[in-house]
Amino acid sequence: MRLFDPWPVFFKREWKRCWPFLTGFAVTGVLITKLTAGLTEEDAKNSKFVQQHRR
């Protein structure tokens, strides 16, 4: 007898509920990655935030 696998049912049900959160999390991650990848060492040297947090 084949055992019932609950994971496909669980993921299908949870995807309907959680897709807005997961999509927003992915978009936010992509934006943060793109913005931080564009920073240079010169930008860091001139940044007040970096200067305050550098020890």
Curated annotation (Swiss-Prot):
GO cellular component, one term: proton-transporting ATP synthase complex
InterPro entries in alphabetical order: ATP_Synthase_Subunit_6 (IPR052867)
Subcellular location: Mitochondrion inner membrane
Biological-process GO terms, alphabetical: proton transmembrane transport; response to cold; response to hydrogen peroxide; response to mannitol; response to oxidative stress; response to salt; response to sucrose; response to water deprivation
Keywords linked to the UniProt accession: CF(0), Hydrogen ion transport, Ion transport, Membrane, Mitochondrion, Mitochondrion inner membrane, Stress response, Transit peptide, Transmembrane, Transmembrane helix, Transport
Topological category with respect to the lipid bilayer: Single-pass membrane protein
Induction: Induced by several abiotic stresses such as salt, mannitol, drought and cold. Under oxidative stress caused by H(2)O(2), transient induction followed by strongly reduced levels. Induced by sucrose.
Transit peptide: 1-11
Segments crossing the lipid bilayer: 21-39
Family indicated by similarity: Belongs to the ATPase 6 subunit family.
Biological role stated in the UniProt entry: Mitochondrial membrane ATP synthase (F(1)F(0) ATP synthase or Complex V) produces ATP from ADP in the presence of a proton gradient across the membrane which is generated by electron transport complexes of the respiratory chain. F-type ATPases consist of two structural domains, F(1) - containing the extramembraneous catalytic core and F(0) - containing the membrane proton channel, linked together by a central stalk and a peripheral stalk. During catalysis, ATP synthesis in the catalytic domain of F(1) is coupled via a rotary mechanism of the central stalk subunits to proton translocation.
Name listed for the protein in its UniProt record: ATP synthase small subunit 6-A, mitochondrial
